[in-house]
């Protein structure tokens, strides 16, 4: 997430009113399911094709690892960036483990230089308060809370149009300080995030001025207190014109 924690608390106005009760299990659209032909984009041995602040990023026990300490704090939110291509229409699978604090997976994002990234973020935090939300780093802030189906209008304002899962069940399914899996799917302006097999958000972004149809992939190491985050089993499926 963004450095300012206050933006985290800007809950979507009227979300509770607009939310719809879950009457049946949410089903990801057929065109967004499956990852046949996915390829590994992290070799588990070194940081080939990945670019991050060397002081903070390394490979430990087969996992990409970001660490800050009291003696070596991050100067601000810093990211390790995949240099192997850009994300357009895709399905991404990532195993992750967070010991404390906050991190996230940036996708279709912008490289601002010096390992600073802005854009869509699949969020995660040590208490699972924000894990699963869609956040826009350096932009519109919280786009969708956990469990919500959201349409972002041309004016940039998110509107809850339905429910995709129960937020408490999502939180209960997250294994604190242990390995979890994120699946992120982007097709056109439609974005879906899943954690441990449960859909956390479903977003249609109709804000043509601020949405991103393509961009980079990166992982966040958040400014603030000491933290450790790890990523492994990173696979990417790229969808062509169909």
Model-predicted segments: where are they?
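Carbohydrate-interacting regions of secretory-pathway proteins
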Residues: 3, 31-242
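Alpha-helical transmembrane segments and their juxtamembrane interfaces
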Residues: 20-23, 242
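C-terminal segment of classical bacterial N-terminal signal peptides
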Residues: 24-29
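N-terminal secretory signal peptides and thylakoid transit peptides that target proteins
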Residues: 2-19
């Amino acid at each position: 997430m963004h450095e300012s924690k206050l933006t985290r608390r800007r809950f979507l106005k009227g979300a509770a009113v607009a939310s719809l009760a879950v009457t049946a299990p949410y089903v990801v659209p057929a065109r967004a399911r499956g990852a046949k032909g996915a390829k590994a984009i992290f070799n588990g041995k070194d940081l080939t094709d990945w670019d991050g602040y060397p002081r903070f990023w390394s490979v430990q026990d087969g996992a990409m690892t970001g660490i800050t300490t009291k003696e070596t704090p991050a100067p601000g939110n810093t990211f390790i960036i995949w240099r192997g291509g850009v994300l357009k229409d895709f399905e991404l699978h990532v195993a992750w483990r967070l010991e404390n604090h906050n991190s996230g997976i940036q996708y279709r994002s912008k490289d601002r230089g010096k390992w600073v990234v802005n854009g869509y973020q699949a969020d995660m935090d040590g208490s699972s308060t924000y894990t699963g939300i869609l956040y826009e780093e350096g932009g519109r802030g919280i786009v969708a809370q956990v469990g919500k189906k959201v349409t972002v209008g041309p004016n940039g304002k998110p509107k809850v149009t339905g429910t995709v899962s129960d937020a408490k069940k999502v939180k209960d399914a997250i294994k604190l300080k242990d390995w979890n899996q994120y699946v992120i799917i982007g097709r056109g302006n439609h974005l879906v995030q899943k954690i441990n097999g449960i859909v956390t958000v479903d977003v249609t972004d109709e804000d043509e001025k601020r949405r991103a149809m393509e961009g980079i992939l990166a992982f966040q190491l958040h400014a603030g207190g000491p933290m450790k985050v790890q990523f492994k089993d990173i696979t990417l499926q790229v969808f062509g014109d169909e």
